[in-house]
Structure formats: C-alpha cells, structure tokens
C-alpha cells in the first residue's frame, strides 16, 4: 500500500511538471506547497526559493489584494481569467492571466490553487512597440555602396516610395533589409506617420494575434483596450520582419486583414478600418519558402507587389572596403580612437572572404578588431577576432631560398626554416613584443618562447 501511494505521488508530480500551465498551491497560511516546472519558467524562479515559503515573502505585489491566491484564501471565492502583475525576488516584472480556486475541507478554507498563463512577453512587446512608434533613423543616403548590384536595388526602392503598395524585401541575414525599409518609409508620403517594426520570429504563436490586432477590454478579466500593430501603424508603415517564420494559419489571418483593410481586436465584434503600408522581409528565396510550405502562395502574391532582392556582400566586393572604412570611422567616434588604415593582408582577406553574415558580420569584425587596439592606426591580422585571424595568410613572405648547389633539405628542415622565418618577421613587426607576436601568430606566449629557445639552441649547435 505504501508503495502504491509513493507511485501515485510520483505520477502526480510528473503530471504537474509536464503540463503547459503554471501551477502554484499554497496552504491556509499562504505557504507554498506545490510549485510546478512551468511556474518556475514563468516566474524565473527555482523551486527551493519558493517551496515552503510564504507567498508574500517571495513575491512583491503593489498591495496584498493584488495576489489572487491571497484573495482566494481570504474570500473563499473562485477567481477566473484575471490579469495579475507582480515582481519576483530579482525585481523582474511578471504578468499572468490566472484562474484561482480556494481549497475547502469541512467548510474551512485549507489553501488555494492558482493556474497561470504567462503574458509577460506580450505586455513587454506591446510596450516596446509603443516606444518605437515613429522611430526611424535611416534614409537612402545611409545605404553605402557604388557597386551596380546595390545601386540597382536603391533605384528601384526609390521608385517604390511614390506609392503605398506592399513591398517584399528578400535577402540573407545582415544584408540591410530594415535599412531599406526605413528608407522607403522616410522617402514616401507616409514619412510623417508612424513606422512600426516587428520581428515575427520573436513572437510565440499564442501571442501573434494579440500583438498584430490588439485586445478589447473584457476579452479576459484585467484586459484593457490595447491597440495592435496595425492600429499603431495607422497612417504609416508596418514592417513585418521574417514573415516566413509565422505559421500558415496565422499567415491566412494576416492575408485577410490585408485584403479587407480592416482588423478586429481579440474579444471585439467590431471591425476597425486600417490605412497601413506593409513592408515584409524574408531571409530566404520566396519561391523556396513557398515550396517548403513556410509561406502561403496567396500571401506572397499579396505582399510582392514590389519585390526587392538585396544582394549579399560577396556579390558586391567593390563595396567591402568602403563599408569597412565607414565602420572604422563610426567606431573611432565611439571609442575615441584614430584608426586610419587596414593592412594589405587584411584587405586581401576581406575581398576573398565569403561573408555569410554579410554587412553585419563586417561591422562586428571591425568593432572587434578595434577593441584589441590601443594607439595603433592600422588594423592588422593580429587585431582580428581569433576565428578570422587563423584564415589570413601572411602577406609578402618569400619562400626561403635553397642554393642550387646544395641538396634540398628534407621536409622537416624546410618546415622549421619557414617557421623560424615567419616568427622572426612577426617579432620584428611588433618590436620583439612577445605578447603581440604570439597573438598575431595565434599561439600562446609559452609556445612562442619555447620555439625561440629551440631556434637559439639549433643555431648554437
């Protein structure tokens, strides 16, 4: 019987920890007796921080009555669909929608159970989007590049400013899609209106409708009238980044809003007309996304009235050094430095590298290099982050000559001779500074000192 009881307890605990809602149970004194894994995730807490401790000692509410668990204990009433905001012991704000029930035994309240759904992210995203309303900084003058590949896209994007047609921007990660989106907005008649940007990949499916279309007071207890992105962008532009990350059913609802030019808030029966220009971005070929069922064909046709394909950096090599120079000047201002040049071997690397992260990768590489510099004025291979430094071949290193009358040395001797030549050149370059030379060579100080001792021993033999 004891074993059966232990087994049932184990089953019960396993179920509690696997369900996808938060569960918090307190006894009649407000001490936590059950706290499942989902609740830990929602509140960013550990079980040992909450279990067997009083609710009001662990969490902070603006007033005690704001705790639905406390209300259930005090009033003995079931509380359904109530929004609650409070703080955990780290000072992080938590927002949940709760169903809370008193536990009654023999007419006496013995505790309370709370079932919670997390809406913290929803609240934060709404605030962020309201704060970002109208915040654009880029124009077409911000887009650098003289290559025909980028100039063609710029010219077509400028033409797109004359209308309010939907625009689809396709390009790899880091190619500058939002820069183009802001430039189109700022060059259009809508420039005086809001510009709202949302990365669709950052939205959980359960929150997308609330974020896009808004909520009406009464949709759930504690809900307020909250405009969605479409209403916030009314009269302006709505940028939907990585739209292919939305699931197909949500894409269908988005398509309906675009076709009908009206939306309906969650919990409302009233349609609201909208006047919004949509700019959508994708980080893959639209045809591939349709074939892979990541993009609805009808939504693609609706969005792709104007389609701009932004070229990757590897297809606009002539712009690389121009962009690098711009990023150097930007960081000179930020870091109070005076970097002016890039060494020839680094330039050659920039021009031959594939740039999978495109312009963003180049910008981060320059910033990383300048973090390794002190008073130098030239970015060299030694300043680049390690993962790039190893890919650069030393420039202008001649092969050590072997006199014709001497027999060719064996492979080991040739390798040692070449290694010595490279190390001596790097040491001279850095004024025999062991640390800097080791950094450029990609080896430790101890390893470099070992090699120098080995060369010294060989020359004395």
UniProtKB/Swiss-Prot annotation:
Residues 143-372 form the Sigma-54 factor interaction domain. It comes from the Bacteria. Transmembrane segments: none annotated. Gene3D superfamilies: 1.10.8.60, Homeodomain-like, P-loop containing nucleotide triphosphate hydrolases, PAS domain. The keyword ATP-binding applies. ATP binds at residues 171-178, 233-242. One of its GO terms (biological process) is phosphorelay signal transduction system. PROSITE patterns: SIGMA54_INTERACT_1, SIGMA54_INTERACT_2, SIGMA54_INTERACT_3, SIGMA54_INTERACT_4. The keyword Nucleotide-binding applies. The modification 4-aspartylphosphate is found at residue 57. Residues 434-453 bind DNA. GO terms for cellular component: protein-DNA complex. Induction: Not induced by arginine, repressed by RocR itself. SUPFAM superfamilies: Homeodomain-like, P-loop containing nucleoside triphosphate hydrolases, PYP-like sensor domain (PAS domain). Positive regulator of arginine catabolism. Controls the transcription of the two operons rocABC and rocDEF and probably acts by binding to the corresponding upstream activating sequences. This is Transcriptional activator RocR. The lineage of its organism: Bacteria, Bacillati, Bacillota, Bacilli, Bacillales.
